[in-house]
Amino acid sequence: MSENQKEVRVRFAPSPTGRLHLGGGRTALYNYLLVKKMGGKFILRIEDTDQKRYVETAEQEIIDGLHWLGIDWDEGPDKGGPYGPYRQSQRKEIYQRYAEQLIDQGDAFYCFCSTDRLSEMKRLQQQRKEFPHYDGLCRDIPVEEARKRIAAGESYVIRFKTPKEGTTTVRDLLRGEITVENKTIDDYIIVKSDGWALYHLAAMVDDHLMKISHVIRGSEWIPTLPLHHLILKAFGWDEPVWIHLSVFLKPSGKGKMSKRESADLIKDGYSIFLTDLKDLGYVDEAVTNWIALMGWSYDDRTEIFNMSQLIDAFSLEHLNPSPAAINFTKLDYFNGVHIRMLEIDDLAQRIQPYFEADGYTADLDTLKKITPIIQERIAGLDEAPKIAGFFFEKEVHPKLEDLVQKGLDAAQCADIATKSYQILSALPVIDKDHGEPEMRALVEELALKPAQVFGVLRVAVTGQKISPPLFESMEIIGQDVVLERIKNAEKMLKAA
């Protein structure tokens, strides 16, 4: 970061080769929190130079995932800005120009080695138990000779010419100084044979031209950090502040979490992909809270944060480079807490799509009545239709074994249904104040346990052994429908 640069400028630069996962979401979040705390600019840059792995729908899914987390940006493909274009596929000529500059100043070279030669070279190195590296065959070909070969149609790539003597030291904010021997740094390809620049060149050029002050990214880039340092040094450019985040471990704490293992998590109702977590009923506030604490902490006590509180509390000094195990139990806890913190109208709107996905026509007005009596009972938005779908069913279909209560037979339970119908049909209205006192009197009259009488009534009205508060539920369902359901249960019990 230049001494003269005052503004904090960060970038989140995903490759549209797949869905946005927890690692990408956390990287974007930390960049966003830093900018909001420091008053800088957040840049979204799409690194789409790998055309073979490009997935057409991935970019929009990444954008949707960021928006779901509550993250927005100041500059990007959809917003423009002073340093665009913000898609690397539209910057090919820029990278080519800078690659040629490196060649002209002796910091890069054209390589004409065939795939077959490189494969044989690698095989022999493995046989000799050497560290795989380019052997430098084309490293000292004169530039004019190389350009004549290119003009004649010979295929080539461009490699960075790393120094082979001495050491390179780079400072990472979390890990301190990282020093490597230059002889261990390969002559990496920076431009492929199809003319597309690789990340090592493209990202460094873009970070410089877009005036990026802090690079917050995954720890998988640490091995090539010395290369990136050398590329910037070759151009004479200032370095950003480097911040390489901690690795995510599997829930067991053993081994690095990978995208390939997400299929196994889905079986247990979990995922490392943000769109899956949304579909599984997690609220964005909980996911944001959760991933923020996997690599950062405010103190050893405070766990619950909304986005505003995260911005106020965030600091780079509290980032932790130690690997973080993915703890889905903690996510479930956060989800329940944040659901209970939502306003009723907000929660009603959020659960509506889950009712519709389960086949219910759930109007918002009714949902606003239901939400207060289920808010404390759901740990995920997807649970709402499972415990409250009966509000929107024309008929419920209770199981006979659920209607028959412990210690009673079908005839006794039919009698409970008959008497319940008589009591409730005589009331002007059924609600939490009208119905429950009368039903408790019935419990005394029949000399039964409350669970037996209310158990018959609950299953008859809701079709479920467990439900939201019974009389509040009956008020929302409406007296006519309640009585019809009790009558149907009575018939079922008498026929048993």
Q: What does each model-found stretch correspond to?
A:
Residues 2-4, 373, 409, 428:
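Post-transcriptional modification and biogenesis factors for structured RNAs
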Residues 10-16, 44-48, 210-215, 269-274, ...:
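Glycine- and acidic
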Residues 431-477, 481:
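Helix-rich, typically C-terminal accessory recognition domains appended to large enzymatic cores
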Residues 109-264, 273, 298:
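Active-site cores that bind ATP or allylic diphosphates and position pyrophosphate for catalysis
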Residues 2-127, 224-237, 286:
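N-terminal Rossmann-like or analogous alpha/beta NTP/dinucleotide-binding catalytic cores
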Residues 403-434, 439:
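Long, amphipathic alpha-helical coiled-coil segments characteristic
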Residues 235-398, 406, 462-496:
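Catalytic adenosine-cofactor/nucleotide-binding cores of aminoacyl-tRNA synthetases and other
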